[in-house]
A protein has these predicted regions:
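Catalytic-pocket segment enriched in acidic/His residues
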Residues: 13
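Short acidic capping loops at alpha-helix termini that bridge into adjacent secondary structure
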Residues: 166-169
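Acidic helix/loop microenvironments that form the catalytic cleft of cell-wall polysaccharide enzymes
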Residues: 176
Length: 270
């Protein structure tokens, strides 16, 4: 199975990488269509920034941001995912045409999410989560990050299945950058096989994360800004593809699509 590319469509004023760039419906739809042209398999539409320290919009504002975009992109033939922690937003997004729910809290932020996903019978991305963005970095402490993340995701999957979600719906995400220090992110990236061994599809979302902006820098140097982390992101796309993951979630689709073509060419030659 080829690794899928999920292109990010942030309809937010404050996302860490591109906040405000696609904040109107028209701009977000145009950006999504451009990502499809670049080779995206899925478009992940979100109306809430999950960068460390971000404030949450109210539900009505989140709906106002994402539903028109999802509706238009779905009408254009795109396979759309909704990036939300709110069950009510997920339900309306599915009605508008979304065919995947991507919840960075894995259903922990809203107790109604499991029921919505079970009723909708759509794929559900379950991320490793230790709290909302304003406090999550306070919980970036692990004895063995790989073991603990795998255990937490396995337990989360079991709980969701007990609440009516079909096991076949679940996709696991280790949550790069969420309650993780750089060393935790590198360790997870080096041990994707452990996540794969859980028996679920895996989504990798390293795109433009801060740990990629520190590679090769001397102590005290400022990390490279998000827009200068796409080469590093493409490198992690190669690592993820070689590990056999289900998908990668990226901002710059073209570079990751090219990286996957290189992987495919090497595998075909072997």
């Amino acid at each position: 199975m080829s690794t899928l590319v999920m292109g990010v469509v942030n309809v937010t004023p404050d996302s860490f990488s591109d906040g405000g760039m696609w904040f109107t419906t028209g701009a977000a739809v145009a950006h999504g269509l451009d990502l499809l042209e670049q080779g995206a398999d899925i478009l992940d539409v979100g109306g809430e920034s999950t960068r460390p320290g971000a404030d949450r919009p109210i539900k009505e504002e989140e709906l106002h941001r994402v539903i028109p975009v999802i509706r238009e992109l779905s009408r254009a033939g795109a396979r759309v995912s909704v990036d939300t922690m709110r069950a009510s937003v997920a339900a309306q997004a599915v009605e508008a045409g979304a065919s995947i729910v991507n919840d960075v809290s894995g259903g922990l932020a809203d107790p109604d999410m499991a029921g919505v996903v079970a009723d909708a019978a759509v794929p559900f991305v379950v991320m490793h989560w230790r709290g909302h963005s304003d406090l999550m970095q306070d919980h970036a402490s692990y004895g063995n990050v790989v073991v603990e993340v795998c255990q937490a995701l396995s337990e989360r999957a079991s709980d969701l299945c007990a609440r009516g979600v079909n096991q076949e719906q679940l996709i696991l995400d280790p949550g790069f950058g969420f309650a993780k220090l750089p060393e935790h992110n590198w360790s997870l990236l080096a041990h994707l096989d452990a996540l794969q061994a859980l028996g679920f599809p895996v989504l990798v979302g390293t795109s433009r994360k801060s740990f990629l902006g520190t590679v090769g820098l001397s102590p005290g140097q400022r990390p490279r800004p998000p827009a200068q982390r796409d080469v590093g992101t493409a490198a992690t796309t190669v690592i993820a593809a070689l590990a056999g993951v289900w998908g990668v979630r990226v901002h710059d689709v073209a570079s990751s699509v090219d990286a996957l073509r290189v992987v495919a060419a090497v595998e075909a030659a072997g």
